[in-house]
Amino acid sequence: MRIEVMIKGNSKEICIPLIKETTLEDIRELSEVEVYDISSGLNAYAILKNSTVCLEYSSKLYEMYIAIFLKMLDDTATSKEIMSDMGGMEPYSLLEVGLINAFIEALIWRVEQGEVVGRYEAFVEDLCRKMSSNLLCEIVSWKQEEDIMNTKFDYLLLSLRLIVMMVEYKTKEEGEIEKKSTFAFAKEYFYKAFALLGETKDLEDDMAFVFRASLTIDALVTRQVAGRISEVFPIVEDLPISKKNMFGIYIQMAEVCMSEDGALNDLLYSVFTTSCLVSLDTGYGNEFVEVLIAMVEQDGGSGGKRIGNVMETFRMIFHSLQDSESRGRERLIWNFLSFLSRIRMGRDMGDLNSIFLKFIVKYPETIELYSNFILINKIDFPLHTLHGISSFGFMKRFYSVLFNKVRKERHDKAHVDKLISEFLKFFLATKNKELIGILPLVPYIPSKREVLYVLYEIYSFLFEKEVIEHVGLFLLKTPALVGISSSIYYNVRYLRHLATRLSLVDVEPRMVVFLGIVYYCESKKLYNFNYTGILEYIQDEDGIRMSRDGLVGVIELIHSGYISRSHEFTLSYVNSLLTIALKPKTIETTLVIIEIILRRILEKEEKIIFMKGIHQRFQELFVLLSSKRFLSDEVSDSYRRLYRSIVERIKCAPNFYNYVVLCLADISFFDGEFPRGHFKSFNDLYNHTLSRMGVVEGFPDIFMVDHGWSCSENTDKAVSGPFLHRVCGSGKEEETKPRETKSHNMYDIIRTGTNDSVMSLESSTGSISLHSSAPMPSISRKAWLEMLDEGIRKREKSVSWLIDVIYTRRSQSSTIRTVLDLLKLRLRNKFEYEDLYILLKAYNILSIRENDSEEFLKHALHRGLDFKTDPAICYKLSMETNGFYRFFFRALHLAVSNLPCNEDLSFPERTQLVSRFDTADLVHIQNTFKQKMVQKLLERSRSPSYRTYFFNVDSLGVIDSLTIIRRLDDPSLVSRAFERLRESKNEMLFYVPQLVQMLRYKKVFEMAFSTLKELAKDEYVAHQLIWNLKANLYVDGRAAVNNYHGTFVRCIEEIMKEMPDGSRDIFLKEEEFISSLTKISSELTPHLRSSKDEKRRRINEYLSRIKLHPGIYIPFYPDLKIIEIVNGSARALQSHSKVPFMASFRVQDPGGQISIKQLIFKSGDDCRQDMLALQIISMFESIFKQANLDIFLYPYKVMATSSGTGIIEVIPNSKSRDQIGKENINNLLEYFEYKFGFKESEGYLTAICNFASSLAGYSLVGYFLNIKDRHNGNIMIDDQGRMIHIDFGYMLEMSPGNLNIEAPLKLTKEIEELLGGTSGKGFEIYQELMVKGFLALRRRSKDLVMMVDSFVDSELPCYRRNAVENFILRFRFELSDKNARRFVLSLIAESSQKFRTWMYDQYQKITNNIAF
């Protein structure tokens, strides 16, 4: 289908054929074309025209129209043809109107972008011809569909916008428009639009635009601007339209007025003599005034061609307002003066000033406007002439407003200087007290010499009237009165009160005033972080000469109460003082004053003395002072005393102190006393100090190099040799330079690790702060700290140097944040007391305390004793804490130091505990320290307890649970205890005897039995339970049935019943094997009197008959499988009435390793008591290990397999003391020399240490368990010299023959001789371990007491009356740690070589043939 589109071109009609109807895709493709020429442009235009009949109107289509037209208009020929066709088109359909609108909008956009609108004159004239009154009426009447009417209205508005552009262009370029008839429609539109304003609310904005556009067109074309304005202006404010549209009309009037001479003057008169501005909102009114100001100033800048004599208009307005009697007169005056106050005229200032002066006195509220007028126009005539027409009260108000504006706004400084000088002179001339309140409002005070004299006289007046306290801010702004002291000739009175206040004696009156100015002004300024005035005064030779010692005293008085509220400010101040002191020409009095100031400041600001640069500058100063030939010795000595006090105070940072002493300070300051330490030579100390300072200053960057991070070019040099030597140089560091002063909240800075004004040691030292580091890889803060800690642990054994980092770099908030975070990370990963001390020390140095410090302190509390802890660290921790923790760390120091203590540690008050600790903490404290006060607190809180020990119900141990089950009546707590047992299956093998005892209590039997069956699901636990149940069936061997016989038998049957078949078979084979072995002992009883060889033959014969099944294991070592009974290994053991024997077994561990294990089998003995004793000894051993105590115990294994039978582990590589004696060795000393070599050999000394360690362990065991029957037959010595006790048949309240003849500890003469006598080194080791072990056991007594208590109802013979109570008494809780130490030493002394020990040994010799 062929389609033809006709285009009425500029000269002829053009027919464009199209092959198809236009689609939206066609339009989209056209919009993407970059450039059009005449041919492609007309074809594209034809497609656009065709789209008006093929497509539906949409905003997207309209946008593409505009885009296409903008590109077409780039080609002049194409644009002419299109404008010709468009000019003849009548807007009928929706898309036709839309196409025309898009073209007009494209034209407007190009004009707005700078294109000359005259290029489109013909098209604009065509638009004017279409602007008929019918079009406007048709739109207003809204007779057609909404879409077409909206589009037509857009057509009208766009057309008027383009026509206005053309009229404004023609007026500007040609002055007058010739084709006036073309634009005649504007007058009709102007009146119709005016009539329609307010009637069409929905179209108000658009009709207001039509009105403004037609007004502009008509006024500019007809050249009747003034007439149109005078016609419209009076009635605009009465129109029922919005303020916005009213404002738009006023603005349009103003802009039109600029096209006609004198028109703007008429508008100005109308605006400011009518309620025009009042009718507008304040915002629109101010904006309108700004437009008028811009027009007046613009015309003024061009010589006033348009406005003419605007000043005459201002006068007319002034007279009109002055004569006005309307009620809104004040508002009109304010509007007019506000307008004048913002104009920069540059001429007629006197006339404008007269207008203001005639109004402001009557209307004081306009003072602010007058002030603005003065400032922006730089009025420079004497303002105090205002006083002639006003009162002092008015002047006070005027200057207050004026100075307030100067403070808030930027104005010409030279002009403001004049204003301030004029005021000060006015104040001095009048000396009126009403004006004193204005002095603090002065924005600043010029430092001109003539002003300084005026200031002197003003202060003289203020001091005389004693009103100096009322001018606070004036003091801050007063410049130093330098250079005028000798030329002050004013006759002033002697102000006694001022002289007394400043402690001035024999000072002439004029200098009293001068020094008063110095004191009051500089004190105020210094408090507000400004020391510049002080620096000027102390260098003012004229002032020093005239005031003599007065200035020295006043400066000292200023600094007497100095408080450092900003480290940066104080550091800058100190550096500035040292800079002056280091000037070669600085006079002696100035040096005296500087020394006084430095002493005062450095007493208060500790951070500065830890800065290397300060020490370097002091050394430079001492060199300079020594070169001053006429300087008095007293001045030099005062500086030396000052520096000595500084060096004494930096000793708390040992690395930094060493560095200062070795690398910076003059050696004469130390009088031959140098830093001490573990160093081989002075050179060793020197190199170590440099290395430490390299770490201190390079932290943290130097530890990140291993991770591939090079935070700065100096990082690798941080600890290198040449670099370290360079550190000693005298180059000034950046840290010593004066900095901008700023006060900070230290806690907030450190908490966030940020500080905009942070000072880093980025200097010749090569140390780099985090602020200066290169960007870090994108990792978390925690990961970065982990890497840092890893780097430190690889290189450093200790981080004590972090204290030096805190002292020397505390101004670098990011570094301090890193130190704190690092320490907390280390404490969480691996708790060390040293790290805790450094963290707390850092908090105290920085005067902060973060919440997590309590977390780490509580960790230390619950950690218990650790004897590997450095005692010095414990003491230091006590110094960094208070309240309970001071007591705790002091007690820890006493325990681990092994030093005599004369200090009585007092437990803290109740309030400190209640406020700081929760119940769980108090439970731990009570169980550790056994304090009556804590006990009462816990009793009031109803915390569960037994025998004054309390339970933490949220963290129950196994022995806690067992005790609660037996002793407490709280059902919920008992249930929780059983639940805890079921959760602790891995620990149950150890507690099997206690689990069995639990069955004796009827109130909990069912739950106990249920729990046992649950635990018996573990195969080996089940085996141990059955054997132990069998061991408890009878009272004594098999003589009498136990009261619980039936109960225990039932339990055995139930456990066996619930065993899987395979597990039951394994147990039966194991039991058969064990029974066959223990049976041998009972079968040998008839042969008790046979020879040893005969007994041995019979035992081996029995053993050879025993069948060994696969999977048989050592009962107390389930992992050791027995693969063979060693042939001929058995032998009978010595016993008075029984025949125990020992046999060897070849066993295999899970790894396949084969070894020999020796066991003893007994029959006729109750082994349960030995089991209990060795359980407790095992707990002793665990406590010692956890406390890092080198105390040896060997809790060998014993297991009762039934009533009266048992198996005992043989202690390998050991002999009894009795056996040693029978080998013709007279004493232990002789044996040790024979066994381990010469007394001074390493092997011998090691054996002595081992012996002392084991002797301490078993002495404590013997003391606490009250073990008796200690003779040479049950004391073993192994091949490393360690003593091991066996056979615990007599303990607690049981002794042989009920005779208690043994000493508390077995310390024979031969033991003392072996240890070198009571003063020997070995004996000292023994005593030290005894004391430490005793204290360690006291701190962990709860579990031990509960373990002893667990067998109270077992009917064991050792449990006689008060057995548990006496066990508790042996901890001596009534003694402090200090007195407990004394008690242990007295116990040792009491047992040493006692007759009771010798007597018992003799008893054993007679009764059991045990000679030694």
From Swiss-Prot:
The keyword Phosphoprotein is assigned to this record: no
Record-linked SUPFAM superfamilies: ARM repeat, Protein kinase-like (PK-like)
UniProt domain PIK helical: residue ranges: 878-1055
Reaction catalyzed: a 1,2-diacyl-sn-glycero-3-phospho-(1D-myo-inositol) + ATP = a 1,2-diacyl-sn-glycero-3-phospho-(1D-myo-inositol 4-phosphate) + ADP + H(+)
GO cellular component, one term: cytoplasm
PI3K/PI4K catalytic domain residues: 1127-1396
SMART domains assigned: PI3Kc
PANTHER family noted in UniProt: PHOSPHATIDYLINOSITOL 4-KINASE ALPHA, PHOSPHATIDYLINOSITOL KINASE
Protein name as it appears in the record: Probable phosphatidylinositol 4-kinase STT4 homolog
Upper taxonomic lineage: Eukaryota, Fungi, Fungi incertae sedis, Microsporidia, Unikaryonidae
Gene: STT4
